A protein has these predicted regions:
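Alpha-helical and coiled-coil interaction segments, frequently adjacent to or embedded
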Residues: 2-228, 363-390
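Short, solvent-exposed coil/turn linker segments
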Residues: 142-145, 235-239, 252, 347-363
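Acidic, glycine-rich loop-and-strand cores that form catalytic or ligand-binding grooves
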Residues: 269-296, 317
Length: 390
């Protein structure tokens, strides 16, 4: 990394609500430039597919790993994060509270001053360790969504304020005390690394040509990466309910993916019929159809990597789902144009964007505002298009 950790300093006076919201808007409006500025702080770290998505070498397999070969482990003992957004190091990113003093957390400030439509502190899975280069294994424990947001979005806010103060020039860790205490963003046990399962959906036509889906995330509706393109579906890895039994039963990337396919592509609700807090997947027709397609080989699902966004610390498990065209057309004949988080991108009246070198360069080469993980996933899928589409 480019600088040593910053020494503690006295916090400036608390920002007023308008000034604080202005920096938050800057994070969305200048996200790509801020991602680049954040990535430059970690110039010695590996990147995913030449993008700004940070990784460790063991997170990048040589080729696609069948989802069935990824083992998920569970730890009931979660280490206390060494870095969080509590205490004096975070005071400078917390605005003044109407009740006096500062807000006590970043999410409390968001809820009161800049709440998006979707902003809930749900039970989530926190990633503790990962390897995808040998026997693939991901180990999780219990956490909550705000545990990740409080740090990730606070360090993004801190960097945006410093970047604005420099006139859009380089920033250094010496002026970023909250980020400086973090250390290596890929050291998962030092923070609450709540993960997203981010999926590139490919429709494979006879002959091998493919197309993909793209989502535009509405900044009025989502807290993370509003105003950007993203592959779809993508969603936080979490159980369907907070019931203790559901937490263990839903520790499944596939179950999470099927829910996201339903919600993002078909506009399905996030609330599911449950008994005892658990969803009976075997009684859900859509789940049965998707699972049958996997078993028949007309849907192939692979994990191709894992990475960390340098700006917000968002941590994404990168997957690819390749559907035979006939299966895709049958399962998603009700493909929506809009959903709870934004809209499905269309070109020339079609949601099917050709999976070509030109399209990958457009959406993963800096020409369009694409979320960092989505850009990395597009590039990885293009690199691995032979085994993925063969």
């Amino acid at each position: 990394m480019s600088d040593q950790a910053a020494a503690p300093r006295t916090a400036p006076p608390a920002a007023d609500a308008d000034s604080w919201r202005r920096i938050r808007r800057m994070v969305n409006e200048h996200r790509q430039a801020l991602v680049v500025a954040a990535a430059q702080l970690y110039d010695g770290m590996p990147r995913v597919a030449g993008t700004d998505l940070l990784c460790w070498p063991e997170w990048q397999p040589a080729g696609p790993v069948d989802l069935a070969d990824v083992t998920l482990g569970w730890s009931s003992r979660a280490p206390v994060p060494g870095a969080d957004a509590a205490g004096p190091a975070a005071a400078h990113v917390l605005p003044a509270s109407p009740a006096g003093g500062r807000f006590t957390s970043y999410t409390a400030a968001v809820a009161a001053l800049d709440r998006p439509a979707l902003f809930e502190n749900r039970i989530c899975y926190r990633l503790l360790s990962a390897t995808l280069t040998g026997p693939a294994r991901l180990t999780f424990t219990r956490s909550r969504y705000f545990d990740a947001v409080n740090l990730g979005h606070a360090v993004a806010h801190e960097l945006a304020a410093a970047w604005a103060g420099s006139g859009g020039g380089p920033v250094s860790l010496a002026g970023l005390p909250l980020r400086a205490q973090l250390g290596d963003p890929c050291e998962l046990r030092r923070r609450c690394a709540v993960t997203a399962v981010t999926t590139l959906t490919l429709r494979r036509a006879p002959g091998g040509r493919a197309s993909f889906l793209l989502h535009w995330r509405d900044p009025a509706r989502v807290h993370h990466a509003g105003g950007q393109y993203q592959v779809m579906p993508a969603g936080i890895f979490q159980p369907v309910t907070a019931a203790p039994a559901a937490r263990r039963r839903d520790l499944s990337l596939w179950q999470c993916m099927t829910r996201e396919f339903s919600e993002e592509l078909l506009g399905g609700p996030e609330e599911y019929p449950t008994r005892g807090g658990m969803l009976d997947y075997g009684q859900w027709p859509f789940y049965r159809e998707l699972t049958a397609a996997r078993q028949a080989g007309t849907l192939r699902v692979s994990c191709v990597g894992l990475g960390v966004d340098p700006l917000t610390l968002a941590t994404d498990i990168l997957t690819v789902a390749v559907f035979d065209a006939a299966v895709f057309d049958r399962l998603f004949r009700g493909l929506v144009t809009r959903n709870a988080e934004g809209r499905v991108v269309t070109e020339n009246g079609s949601a099917a964007i050709p999976f070509t070198a030109e399209a990958v360069h457009r959406f993963a080469g800096g020409r369009e505002p694409t979320q960092t993980a989505g850009a990395a996933l597009l590039r990885l899928a293009w690199q691995h298009r032979g085994p993925l589409l063969g």
